[in-house]
């Protein structure tokens, strides 16, 4: 419905879709509406920050410079330098290998990519496990445990989001007020 409103009110706009299911929604908009649409993944914007935090390198966050390239949902962090121009990848590779060897965590698939491909992928380990046939295999269910892949992550997240929306709806209906904090 909002696409039809946009066709009427702002037909020359460019719609930037950051919502999931991103590919399906973007494809629908491109096929069945006249609105120019691009689908984008939010993972690119937080990729290097989350990587440095996961590896205990928070002191490198400020002033960092990065180069990311690739297609949507499969971008790669090709370069990451600190504020002084030092390449952070040698230390990232060392810490990622150590972390994967010594503890279970939520980024094991992407750290395995670093081990074999040399670079960090922008998309989550859960999505990478879905996209790449090496991690979720019916003949090797132990891979799911080995790489700590939460097969129920997205359904669980949806359940929590729906609960949040229901609470928000109840709050709005109760007092008629909507609050918003600038992010």
Indicate residue ranges for each PLM-predicted region.
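Acidic, His- and aromatic-enriched active-site or binding-groove loops in soluble protein domains
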Residues: 35-51
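Rossmann-fold NAD(P)-binding glycine/threonine-rich loop
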Residues: 1-32
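Short, surface-exposed basic-aromatic patches at helix termini and helix-loop junctions that form
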Residues: 8, 27-37, 53-59
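Long, compositionally biased stretches enriched for glycine and/or charged residues
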Residues: 53-183
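Flexible loop/turn segments at secondary-structure boundaries
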Residues: 23-26, 47, 75
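A structural signal for short, well-ordered beta-strand segments and their strand-loop junctions
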Residues: 15-19, 39-41, 68
């Amino acid at each position: 419905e909002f696409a039809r409103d946009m066709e009427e009110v702002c037909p020359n706009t460019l719609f930037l879709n950051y919502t999931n299911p991103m590919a399906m929604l973007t494809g629908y908009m491109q096929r069945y509406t006249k609105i120019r649409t691009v689908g984008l993944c939010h993972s690119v914007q937080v990729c290097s920050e989350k990587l440095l935090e996961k590896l205990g390198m928070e002191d490198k966050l400020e002033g960092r410079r990065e180069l990311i390239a690739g297609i949507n949902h499969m971008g790669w962090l090709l370069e990451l330098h600190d504020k002084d121009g030092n390449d952070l990848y040698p230390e990232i590779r060392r810490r990622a290998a150590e972390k994967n060897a010594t503890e279970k965590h939520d980024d094991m698939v992407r750290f395995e990519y670093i081990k074999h491909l040399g670079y960090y992928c922008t998309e989550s380990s859960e999505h990478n496990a879905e996209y790449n046939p090496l991690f979720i295999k019916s003949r090797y269910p132990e891979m799911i445990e080995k790489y700590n892949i939460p097969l129920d992550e997205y359904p669980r997240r949806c359940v929590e989001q729906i609960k949040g929306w229901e609470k928000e709806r109840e709050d709005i209906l109760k007092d008629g007020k909507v609050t918003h904090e600038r992010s």
